[in-house]
């Protein structure tokens, strides 16, 4: 995993996370497989429109309905199609910390610019525990 300080990350975000961003939906084929061509088409369209970035497997991307392997497949497709032409963010939340680490590592390997991690959504903690 990348090593950087909180301040370095904030400085990078202040400079780079600007403009219009979009959340990619995860399209499926009639056979209920990930629609690779659909994802590629959506990414190309965002680039054509001048979007600054795209997030995948977020709420609109139905992260809760995808297997870990499907989420990784989406990361691979988005990374390949975006080719550095827009910033990419991967939602890596899961109820298992091992799966979070696996997804985060895979997204980093695919050269994603940002990771999005929501606070645990099953057994929740007090506000100060989440912030820590």
Question: What function would you assign to each model-found segment?
Answer:
Residues 2-132:
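Active-site beta->alpha loop and helix N-cap motifs at the rims of alpha/beta catalytic domains
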């Amino acid at each position: 995993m990348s090593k950087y300080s909180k301040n370095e990350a904030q400085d990078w975000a202040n400079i780079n996370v600007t403009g219009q961003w979009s959340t990619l939906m995860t399209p499926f084929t009639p056979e209920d497989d990930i629609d690779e061509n659909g994802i590629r088409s959506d990414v190309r369209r965002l680039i054509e429109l001048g979007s600054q970035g795209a997030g995948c497997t977020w709420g609109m991307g139905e992260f809760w309905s995808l297997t870990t392997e499907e989420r990784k497949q989406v990361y691979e497709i988005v990374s390949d199609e975006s080719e550095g032409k827009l910033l990419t963010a991967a939602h890596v939340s899961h109820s298992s910390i091992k799966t979070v680490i696996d997804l985060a590592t895979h997204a980093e390997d695919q050269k994603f610019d940002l990771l999005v991690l929501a606070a645990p959504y099953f057994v929740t903690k007090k506000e100060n525990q989440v912030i820590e």
